[in-house]
Amino acid sequence: MKATTIERIEDKLYQNRYLVDTRRPHITVRPHRSPSPSLLALTQICPAKCYEVNEIGQVAIVSDGCLECGTCRVLAEASGDIKWNYPRGGFGVLFKFG
């Protein structure tokens, strides 16, 4: 009997490459004293886990591994919690498979 190998999403994401624009991040989080419900939701729903609650209780982003899927844009841009732009040409995610 042949053993079944389960592929993990982390292994697939590891294959992608990123060219990070350190001078101009494509996503910024609005300064806030306490995070809104939509910002807190981003810590759970971002497929690349780019959002996290920092040591002072604010939601911060590390966009280095961003997949540019737009999930955060749909959830939080209209409320003004984040500002989202496409990365400048040549920067951003470089997908390995497609």
Swiss-Prot record:
To ferredoxins from P.putida and C.tartarivorum, ferredoxin I from A.vinelandii, ferredoxin II from D.desulfuricans. One of its GO terms (biological process) is nitrogen fixation. One of its GO terms (molecular function) is iron ion binding. It comes from Rhizobium leguminosarum. The gene is fixX. Disulfide bonds: none annotated. The keyword Electron transport applies. This is Ferredoxin-like protein. Coiled coil: none annotated. Could be a 3Fe-4S cluster-containing protein. The keyword Metal-binding applies. Keywords: Electron transport, Iron, Iron-sulfur, Metal-binding, Nitrogen fixation, Plasmid, Transport.
